[in-house]
Curated annotation (Swiss-Prot):
Protein name: S-protein homolog 25
Any one of the GO BP annotations: rejection of self pollen
Gene: SPH25
InterPro entries hit by this protein: Self-incomp_S1
Keyword match Glycoprotein: yes
Signal peptide stretch: 1-20
Compartmental location: Secreted
Keywords, alphabetical: Glycoprotein, Secreted, Self-incompatibility, Signal
Protein family membership: Belongs to the plant self-incompatibility (S1) protein family.
Sugar attachment sites: N71, N84
An example Gene Ontology CC term for this record: extracellular region
Length: 136
């Protein structure tokens, strides 16, 4: 009986929170240079968004999603740029560990610049360089 009550409480908590849970956001920016195109390929365990291109200072590419419970929600993106896409990096752009309560309203901003890849968790904070490009 106690086990059944626990399962019911977890189910109610999950569905109740998931209804009110604001989607998480991964935002990708091309801040390379005028005329420079950022090629990217984003995927999760359940979704493959395919290879896309983003022009310099174009509207950011946005991925909106809910965490999967109790599985590990993870998004990876390969960024490529430069002549013949000779610079690249495969980035884990979002990761939420296994949990019973989902994360809600998380933000991950990733910007490609000539000197590397920049990151922020809030809109009102400056982007910080966290990765250098790999030369293929």
């Amino acid at each position: 009986m106690n086990h059944s009550v626990f399962v019911i409480l977890i189910t109610i908590t999950y569905f109740g929170l998931n209804q009110a849970c604001i989607k998480n956001i991964v935002e990708i920016l091309n801040q390379l240079a005028p005329g420079q195109i950022l090629e990217y390929h984003c995927r999760s365990e359940d979704d493959n968004l395919g290879v896309k291109q983003l022009n310099f200072n174009a509207t950011p590419f946005v991925i909106r999603f809910h965490d999967e419970i109790p599985n590990l929600t993870r998004w990876n993106c390969i960024f490529r740029q430069g002549p013949n896409n000779s610079y690249s990096y495969d980035i884990e752009v979002y990761k939420a560990g296994p949990r019973l309560i989902p994360r809600c309203g998380q933000l991950r901003v990733w910007a490609a610049r000539i000197d590397g890849i920049y990151f922020a968790r809030k809109y009102n904070t400056p982007l910080v360089r966290v990765l250098s490009w790999n030369k293929n």
